[in-house]
Design a protein with these regions (language model features):
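Beta-rich carbohydrate-recognition and catalytic domains
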Residues: 1-26, 30, 34-91, 100-158, ...
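Electrostatic interaction modules used in gene-expression and signaling proteins
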Residues: 325-327
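Short, conserved clusters of charged catalytic residues that mark active-site
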Residues: 245
Length: 353
């Protein structure tokens, strides 16, 4: 398969945890981003308090000489306050991905709620990037051909495309990437992996689903009802040997949709324990603009792998986890989690210009 004509160049660390802030003592990581009505770029980091309790904060991105260099903290925008976002001994709203969905004129945040039955994907929306209104947990339509119910399984790495695409039926649709996890041993010992019919590889892979654009325009609650899901990208390269997941919202490029993703290799613990001994690296895939279910190209090697100290050592070492991409002054910058402890920035560049 054709390789991806893009590369990432590491810029540096933009945000580290504040040891004097009890909400940040266990790390800042895996941010979303959004442009505010004031023309400023805002970062939405996952901040982690003692006991692995995560919140989503907001910070203004400080730009110097055309590139992001620091942040100005502005407080918390989402906490695990809803009953389905916390359990008896756990809580969290985690790993936001934020997409400005142009046909709706809205910023859509997808995040992971760490509730009583483990991680569950959810959504919130905003018009001003300050106040976020929850739409609730994500639900997947029943598809008899899968011989399964996607709602049984934890699902992470959900992210919207920024513009409408043709759905499988040809109707204008909003496309959503998601990543189901089939192993149910965390819920009931011995249950094991239960992939749907037709899926022979039970490693977590990237799926795509759709929301009818006309329906979403009439009723925003429709955004949480994802239909017509199917797997599109399974682990293939060596750095994806354990699992793969979507990163930022896909970026429109001349070749199609550029999707940055994380690939995971090495040890994989059961359940939701930190994956010590694993390695997270950033790769890229290009999806067809006319049919994003079709892969045009993918990277055989990582675009960015853990190398510097902030990426190698932290709460979970050896992690590069891309979650946001923004254009500043004609240059594309990727924001990523570093070792589950800090936030870094890299520049995305074409390699064949």
């Amino acid at each position: 398969m054709t390789d991806v004509p893009y590369a990432l160049r590491r810029i540096g660390t933009i945000m580290t945890s504040d040891a004097n802030d009890p909400f940040e003592v266990e790390g800042v990581l895996n941010p979303g981003t959004a442009w505010g009505p004031d023309g400023e770029l805002y970062l939405y980091p996952r901040i982690v308090a003692e006991g692995n309790v995560s919140r989503i904060a907001r910070a203004r991105v400080v730009v110097d000489d055309g590139q992001p260099v620091a942040v100005e903290r502005l407080g918390v925008v989402l906490s695990p306050d809803e009953g389905w976002e916390y359990g008896a001994s756990n809580a969290g709203v985690e790993d936001p991905r934020i997409t400005f969905v142009a046909p709706l004129g809205l910023h859509v945040m997808t995040y992971v709620a760490y509730g009583p039955l483990g991680p569950k994907s959810a959504m919130a929306v905003s018009t001003d990037t300050v106040t976020w209104r929850r739409l609730g947990p994500v639900r997947f339509a029943y598809q008899p051909e899968l011989d399964s119910d996607l709602n049984l399984f934890p699902n992470k790495d959900i992210v919207f495309f920024p513009d409408a695409v043709p759905g499988p039926d040809g109707r204008p649709s909003l496309a959503v990437l998601h990543r189901p996890m089939w192993d149910l041993d965390w819920l009931r010992d011995g249950e094991g992996a239960r992939p749907p019919a037709g899926i022979d590889d039970d490693r977590p892979s990237i799926w795509i689903g759709y929301i009818d654009l006309e329906a979403a325009t009439r009723d925003l609650s429709t955004l949480t009802h994802i239909e017509k899901s199917e797997m599109i990208v399974a682990p293939e390269a060596w750095y994806e040997s354990a699992k793969i997941g979507a990163g930022p919202s896909p970026l429109r490029v001349p070749e199609g949709w550029l999707l940055l993703h994380h690939g995971v290799s090495g040890a994989q613990p059961k359940g939701f324990e930190l994956a010590h001994g694993s390695k997270y690296a950033a790769g890229a895939i290009i999806l067809d603009a006319a049919d994003p279910r079709r892969i045009i190209a993918r990277s055989s090697e990582p675009l960015l792998a853990p190398e510097v100290a902030e990426e190698v050592s932290g709460t979970l070492g050896n992690v590069v986890f891309p979650t946001a991409i923004e254009t500043i002054g004609g240059r594309d910058f990727v924001f990523y989690g570093m070792a589950d402890s800090s936030i870094g920035v890299a520049e995305l560049r074409r390699t064949n210009d």
